[in-house]
Every structure is written in C-alpha cells, then in structure tokens.
C-alpha cells in the first residue's frame, strides 16, 4: 500500500521556474528528473505552494500527472475550483483549457510527464489576465533549463 505521508522531499534539488519576465515565478519550484531527447519527453517534479495559485497557463501537449504529496487543486480562469487530486491520484491529460493550479493546506508535489513529442511544439503557454499568451515553453526550453541547472 502506498504511504502518502512518507515522501521525503528534502532529497529533491528544487529550482525556480523562470516566469515570462525571467524572474522566478511565484509559488512554484521544479526538479527536472529526466529529459528524453529521442522521444521528446520531459519528466518533472513540481512543487506548488500551499493555498496559493501558480501562473495562469494552458497545456498544449499531452501529459500525465501523479500527485506525490499533498493535494493538487485546479482552478478555472474565473477562480472556480475545478478539480482536487489528492496524493496517489494519476491523471493522463491532453491539451486543454486555461487554468491555474496550487496546493491545498500544504505544499503539493506533483510528478508531470510532459509529452510534446517534438522539440519545438509548445508544452505550455503562460497566459495573462486576458488569457493572451505571454510565453510559450517547449521541449528545447526545458532541456536548456535542465542543462543550466545541471552545470
């Protein structure tokens, strides 16, 4: 049986995720676990702050998530709570609507397998308050970030 309380995140090397302005985005950190250059898949642990929301965004490629610790809350652009995924929940997703995410009463740690299957097609679009694209992030961007953080 999965013991959702035993995950020791102190072993994770958390790094900031640069926002559209180049400064670290609020309420989010990441640890890139693997970059598969052949298949164009990136495996990442994200940590979202408790009772906070990350940047508004849209997934533009296939992905899978697994909530490792805490609970992942997903919100619609109007702020309405759309979904709650506690530790132990897996979800396979496709490109979809704009949303934001965050932790519940504690920080949430979520494993994402990002699957653009292309070096240049976007994985995410970061959106402004009018849902206009501020920044697109693709496989090469995450690969470069991984190389920067690994050096």
Positions of the model-derived regions?
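Glycine- and acidic-residue-biased ligand/ion/polar-headgroup-sensing regions
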Residues: 50, 59-78
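Conserved catalytic motifs of the protein kinase core domain
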Residues: 41, 63, 107
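Ligand-binding loop in jelly-roll beta-barrel domains
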Residues: 95-123
